[in-house]
Each structure stands twice: as C-alpha cells, then as structure tokens.
A protein has these predicted regions:
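Short amphipathic recognition helices of helix-turn-helix/homeodomain-type DNA-binding modules
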Residues: 1, 47-49, 53-105
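Conserved hydrophobic/aromatic packing and binding residues within compact polymer-binding modules
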Residues: 8, 22-23, 33-36
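A short, Lys/Arg-rich alpha-helix, primarily the initiator
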Residues: 1-21
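Residues in the helix-turn-helix
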Residues: 21, 32, 61-64
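Alpha-helical residues within the helix-turn-helix
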Residues: 13, 24, 53
Length: 481
C-alpha cells in the first residue's frame, strides 16, 4: 500500500466508516473506493475531492491527502522537485514584495569583543559567526569569505543580509557546495537554490558558488568531526556537522593552510553558474550560442515580446524609446529568428498580464527598452497576441501561482537554465545554470505545470484578452479630444 492509500484507510476508520457504508452514504462508486484504500488503483482528483468532502475532514487533513495523492500520481521524486521549485518562487515573491534582496538594518550592535574561541551551543556558535563576519566586513577594504557550509543552510545568508547594508561594502564569497549524485535526491540539489538565488540577487554580495558530486548523505554528517568551515583573511571558523559548536582560529599558519587547501578543492569542483550584474554584458551572455536552440521553455510575468509584436514593431519601439540599444538589434534580430523557429512553451502569470493591460508595464527585454506601453500600443500588442495565441504553447498561470514580477526564467534544450532578475536598467542579475540535476528538475517541473491546477483554461484566457482590448479601446475613446 502507498502512503496515500494508507492515509485514506486511516481517515475512513477514524470517521467511523468502512468502504460499503461510505459509498452508500456519499454515493461514491464502491469499486473505485475499495481500490483507492487498498492501493490497487489511483482514482481521479475529483473522486478524491468527493472522498474528503464526504468525510468532512479538516483543511489540514485535506491538504495532506491531496499532497499524498499528487505524490502518488507523479512520483515522489517529481513531487519533491515540484514542491521545492514552487517554494523557491514563493520565497522570491516575498523578497520582491519586501522591496529588495537587501534591507537596511535598524540596529547597530557596536563593537563586538571575543571572550572565548570555542562555542558549545547554537547560540554561542551564532555569536562566533557574527563576530567573524562583522570583523571581516569592518576591517577589510575588500572583504572575502570562503566556505563549504551546506548549500541549504540559512545561517550565513541571514547574517550577511543583516550586516552588508550597515557598511556599504561589497563582499566576495566563494562557496563550495556538495551535490547529490543520486537522481532520487535531486531535490536536495534544488533546495540549495533557496539560498543561492537570493544571494546572487543581493546588492553588495559577489557570490560565486562551486559544486562537486558526492554520495555523502545528510545521515552521514553526525559521524564527521567539524566538517564545515568559514575562512576569512584573519579567521578560520570550524563548525560541527549540525552547526551547534564552533572553534575559531586566528593563527596565520592555520589560515594559510586552510586557504591553500580551499583553493585546491575549487580546482576539483565546477562553477555552478555564470552570472553578470551588468546590463550590456548580460545581453551578450543571453544571446550566446542561440543558434543551437531547438527547444525553449520560458516563465515570465507577461507573455514573450515576440508574442506581443512582430520584430519590426519591436525594433521601431526600441529606436523610439531606447536608441542606445540600437547596436544590439542586429544580433537580437538573428536571435529572435531562431527563437521563432524553435519548439516553444511559454508560461506567464495572470497578475503580470493584468498589470501590463492596466498600466502598460511589461517584463523581460521589453521592460528594459520600452519604459511603458501606451493604451494604443497595448491594444496593438493584445490583438497580435490573441491572433497568434496557441493553447499548446501559451499558458496563463492563475492567481494561486506565486511568482515575482521581476524574474524571467528560460530553459534551453533542457540543459541550460537562465534566471534573470530585472528590477530596472540599473538593477539586473543574470544567471546561467547548466548543472544536469537542476536543469532536469526544471524540465520536468514545466511538463507537470502545463497540465496542473495552476493553468487558466484557454477559453477564459481568450475572454480576458478580449475584455482588456475592449476596455483599452474605451479608454482611448474617452481621452481622445
């Protein structure tokens, strides 16, 4: 029996029913119910909804049942990967709503004084970490930090985001991360993105992650003696496997040896990503190797530029609004021609789409070169989109899907993942990830997303587009003198 069927059987018994009695009381098909609770066959989602309603279970219990059902339907690994990616989007949405990936500090802790170089509990260990970070950022002109902390750990990102805004300095961080080789544990590799992506998007942090593969699991950590470390110019902080204890070294010979060995480790690892925070450089990186693109999947707040307008219309708008980007247009035109020939699958959010229709604010490339679309331009683009809309290639995500307006994601040929955070021309973070387990997880995620509860039906999407065309026509009629 599966976890899903066991839970269904448990709820059935707890609520005083058996298969026969519940099928009679709730008009549920008895054979389907019997096969569900014995794990012989998985029913459709509507039947599970009716089962939950018939038992009058609580909302937390219903959520548990539906989660177990989805896990059974798509497989535990795919479910964990999907959940991890959705939680990442929720986290990035929350950070965006909080107005940035760095927030000012409202407390000055003053000068910290070291009393003991050894910590014996988590509280003391956090104090040691604070001490090392604060001293490094305060005293170094160009502070650097090297570490092999678990990629999923929140401790270092938490204190960096507290301290960096206080000093107005940029810190270089090189992070050596352990990745799982087993595909069944790929979600652990994905979980590192919860810390990596916000750090990459943070002002004042030059974050460079490296990775290596190992069969070492989380269960092995308790058997390791102080396996984690943080290295700065003047300190080495050794940390226990559960980060509850620490030993601080300041001996120059120890520092030199740790730094040398860390560099050796980097030579046997791989950079996890390419990145840029320069707009011109990011555009050039984005258009690299585009002639090899065959399959492309994108996720953005609004539809792709090429779905809103033809190339000539787009280039005319660039000349009008941002002539400084004209030198890029020949290369970009070739890029768009390749994109239009590729197998495309595009997702966009209903919230971002409504924002565009109501305020003329787009996302992606057009948000760089066209500050705001006029009502007339919006009508033209919506008509063009409606004419070329395909339910197989275009998917509007409903309001239950949490996603930041400033983030654009693109997966090319299932092995190159692009993440672009674009608040405005001055604040861009561009990332390329080509690690196979992460790219494969996103590829599977998009396949599942296209057939999920987050998709707005085609007829509703077309109706919404037509509604906004009518509203914008009325708006232009009202403001015409």
């Amino acid at each position: 029996m599966s976890k899903f069927s066991e839970k269904c059987k448990e709820l059935l018994t707890e609520n005083g029913y058996n298969v026969y009695r519940l099928s009679q009381a709730a008009s549920l098909e008895r054979t389907t119910l019997q096969r569900m609770v014995t794990g012989k066959r998985l029913p459709g989602p509507e039947f599970v909804e009716q089962f939950c309603q018939a038992l009058r279970i609580s909302l937390p219990e219903k959520k548990e049942i539906m989660d177990l059902y989805k896990m059974e339907a798509i497989g535990e690994t795919a479910y964990r990967n999907q959940t991890t990616i959705l939680h990442l989007f929720e986290k990035l949405s929350t950070l965006e709503k909080n107005k940035g990936f760095n927030k000012r500090s409202i407390v000055d802790y003053g000068e910290m004084k070291l009393i003991s170089p050894i910590s014996n509990d988590k509280y003391e260990t956090e104090l040691l970490l604070q001490y090392v970070l604060r001293k490094t950022i305060q005293e170094q002109e160009s502070p650097e930090l090297y570490t092999n902390l678990p990629g999923t750990d929140t401790l270092l990102p938490h204190y960096l985001n507290l301290m960096i805004p206080q000093y107005g300095k940029a810190i270089l961080i090189k992070h050596l991360i352990h990745f799982q080789t087993n595909a069944s544990y790929a979600y652990e590799n994905l979980e590192t993105l919860h810390q990596i992506i916000p750090l990459c998007f943070s002002a004042g942090i030059n974050y460079i992650p490296f990775y290596y593969y190992s069969k070492l699991s989380r269960n092995d950590r308790p058997n390791l003696l102080y396996p984690f470390y943080i290295i700065t110019e003047k300190y080495v902080l050794q940390l226990a496997s559960d980060l509850s204890k620490g030993i601080l070294h300041s001996d120059p010979a120890i520092l030199q040896e740790y730094t040398k060995e860390f560099q050796n480790c980097l030579e046997h690892s791989s950079p996890l990503l390419q990145q840029s925070k320069n707009l011109d450089e990011a555009l050039q990186l984005y258009m690299t190797s585009f002639d090899t693109i065959q399959d492309i999947t994108s996720l953005d707040a609004t539809p792709c530029d090429s779905d809103f307008m033809d190339n000539e219309y787009f280039f005319d708008r660039v000349k009008e609004h941002s002539p400084e980007y004209a030198p890029f247009m020949n290369a970009y035109k070739s890029f768009l021609n390749v994109i239009n020939q590729a197998n495309r699958n595009d997702f966009f959010t209903i919230n971002g789409f409504q924002k565009y229709c109501e305020y003329g604010i787009s996302s992606g490339t057009s948000s760089i070169v066209i500050p705001k679309f006029s009502p007339e331009e919006r009508i033209t683009s919506l008509k063009y989109f409606l004419e070329h809309f395909s339910n197989e290639n275009h998917h509007m995500l409903n309001s239950t899907f949490s996603y930041p307006d400033s983030l654009y994601i693109e997966l090319r040929n299932n092995h190159s993942l692009f993440l672009i955070n674009l608040a405005d021309k001055a604040n861009i973070s561009f990332i390329i990830i080509q690690e196979s387990s992460i790219c494969n997880a996103f590829s599977e995620f998009f396949q599942l997303l296209a057939d999920s509860e987050y998709i707005t039906p085609e007829n509703q999407t077309r109706t919404l587009i037509q509604k906004y065309i009518r509203q914008l026509k009325q708006l232009t009629f009202d403001i015409t003198p």
